[in-house]
Amino acid sequence: MIRLPADDRASSPYTGYTRAHWEAAADALLAAVEPYATPDRALYHLPGGRVSRSGRLSDGLEGYARTLLLAAFRRDETVLGRYAEGLAAGPGGVWPRITDRGQPLVEAASVALALRLTRPLLWDRLDDAVRGRTAAWLADALTARPWPCNWELFPVTVGGFLAEAGHREEAARKAIDRGLERIEDWYVGDGWYTDGDGRKFDYYNGWAMHLYTVLHAWLSDDGELLARYGRRLSRHLADHARFYGGDGAPLRQGRSLTYRFATTAPLWLGALTGHTPLPAGETRRLASGALRYFLDGGAVDERGLLPLGWLGPDPSFVQDYSGPASPYWASKGFLGLLLPPGHEVWTAREEQAPAGRADAVHPLPAPNWLLQSTRSDGVVRLHNHGSEDVRWDPYYTRLAYSTATSPLPAYDNSVLVGGDPGRTEIEPLGTGEGWIASRHTVRAGITVTSLVAVRGAVEVRAHLVAGAAPGTPVRVTGWPAGEGVRAELLPAAGLSAELAGV
């Protein structure tokens, strides 16, 4: 558990959190992982029975890199000194090499970003031999082949640091140009990137695609790049602010949700770089609301660690690439600590979040989503008619998601044709004020066209099945059970009344 200062309801009437609460949370998380460092401090082997597909050594590097990033945002010289000891050993043969599509490429980006952010406090204080070994280890990221998704930005992030540090500058600039050019293919407008080819929309849009591009431009003092990426970030934040429930909970959609309050990184990024449409008080209310939701909900265990899960351990939130230290990607949520105490994001009085102001329906044409929120219960619902994932992940293929429920293996929010819940080749048919539509393939020759109309807390869903043999059973499911919320499924036409339920 984490001990925090008393609530400050004068400046933060909605969450009670101030900068002091964020500092205390960061300090507690950093202190809790320290006992799990190896004697040379190059690896952090966090407890848990799970080993990721990359192996224990890579998982230990992940523990070092992701908590180093938290230390970089906190900028505590004593803590950074401990990570300096790890740099003396890690790149000299302890850490696994950076290879094509290997997990160390991911962690190299965190190491490089942390070193760039804290250069006077950490990098500049290392001796020449340690700097040389670290730069040589990082340099493999410049030519390692990434997966064709947000991974393209890891060589960019490493390249930005190495170019600034004067190491392999030409190769670094080539890696930067290559990665930034690659992601242009995935920008679909209105502040939205797909995470690779296809229609993969999720939180990686904010905590990866926007985060790495905008930070690179900002740290490089490249006005032209920052203007381009900053405009995109600002446009995204106008939508992103609506992804949080009245209780601070982020929408549960997409993979890697065990990163928890990393969802707040783009909020802080907008304030840090001046590219945000949100008032300072609203930015802090959204970010602090998310942090409080997780801390109050039990996301930190009795050892002070972040386990794999959501509000506490939960294997349904785990991917095969997840290791014991994976949740510490949540460190990105502490980006706001780079803003000085006197910045308006810390001094302004909290303002109400969108979900708490009024009932709202908000179309997002780029991903073909529709957001529906109700002030009375603070629940936000996302009607998904544009994002899919070839891995049949329930966090992508459902018709709807919310801030109060998690998808179930039993196919909630689905249309099952002949028992088949397939939902691929989603074709967006548009979205507007209060409606959204799409067509998807169940299996070869069978499609479902879906239209949803919403108002207040009510949803009307209509589905047209084409290509199925006469008499094929069709089952339509609604919301899964959620704590403190109630949903009713009432058939209006074409469905048996026996299917009505709660």
Predicted regions and their residues:
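Carbohydrate-active enzyme catalytic cores, enriched for enzymes
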Residues: 93-96, 245-385
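Solvent-exposed loop and beta-edge segments used for protein-protein assembly and interaction
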Residues: 61, 105-107, 364, 453-457
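Aromatic-lined, polymer-binding surfaces characteristic
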Residues: 60-61, 69-74, 80-268
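Extreme N-terminal leader/anchor segments
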Residues: 1-92
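Extended repeat-based interaction scaffolds and adjacent low-complexity, acidic/S/T/P-biased segments
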Residues: 391-502
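Generic alpha-helical structural element
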Residues: 18, 56, 100, 148, ...
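Hydrophobic side chains in beta-strands
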Residues: 69, 372-374, 465
